[in-house]
């Protein structure tokens, strides 16, 4: 069994003060909500706690308990409904494994000859545009088809300011590094 550092940004847990007791509970502690108290880190404005992870475990369900009374799920994480019908957050360990990430040196690579036998000197300014081809790509603009939709219907919508919340965090680069690793593997075939 190993430990996993769970980090939750301060602005994700709304309506709580630093005096409130915030406990993470889930499958890993049999929903006892006593051992895994979130600690606030003022320098990064995050709450942190180490949670256990069994070897080979790819995900775990969890919730946050506020002051031993209020059980909440957070829009920041994916949700799943368990066998009893309860909605819980789910944490995918595989997406966050540091062992899958590697340092990829980014340096210009010039080719010796093109198909016509001419050297390519302008490859130094080349770039690769990485985008998703899924139904809701992060690079696509989502247009609301019903402009009469009221704000109260949007309560369950996840809203994040990616420019503020994630720019200084190491975790924000992990996804980019995974994509870069896949691109590098593709090019080396």
From Swiss-Prot:
It is found in: Cytoplasm, Cytosol; Cytoplasmic vesicle, Autophagosome. A motif (ATG8 interaction motif (AIM)) lies at residues 127-130. Keywords: Carbohydrate metabolism, Cytoplasm, Cytoplasmic vesicle, Glycogen metabolism, Phosphoprotein. InterPro entries: AMPK1_CBM, Ig-like_fold, Ig_E-set. Residues 1-96 are annotated as: Binds glycogen. Pfam families: AMPK1_CBM (PF16561). The modification Phosphoserine is found at residues 107, 172. Residues 176-187 are annotated as: May facilitate interactions with the autophagosome membrane. GO terms for molecular function: autophagosome-membrane adaptor activity; glycogen binding. The keyword 4Fe-4S does not apply. Induction: Induced during prolonged nitrogen starvation. GO terms for cellular component: autophagosome; cytoplasmic vesicle; cytosol. CDD domains: E_set_AMPKbeta_like_N. Disruption phenotype: Disrupts glycophagy (autophagy of glycogen). Residues 97-189 are annotated as: Required for sequestration into autophagosomes. Interacts with ATG8. Autophagy receptor for glycogen that facilitates the sequestration of glycogen assemblies into autophagosomes as part of bulk autophagy; the autophagy of glycogen (glycophagy) is stimulated during prolonged nitrogen starvation and during sporulation. This is Autophagy receptor ATG45. It comes from Saccharomyces cerevisiae (strain ATCC 204508 / S288c) (Baker's yeast). The lineage of its organism: Eukaryota, Fungi, Dikarya, Ascomycota, Saccharomycotina.
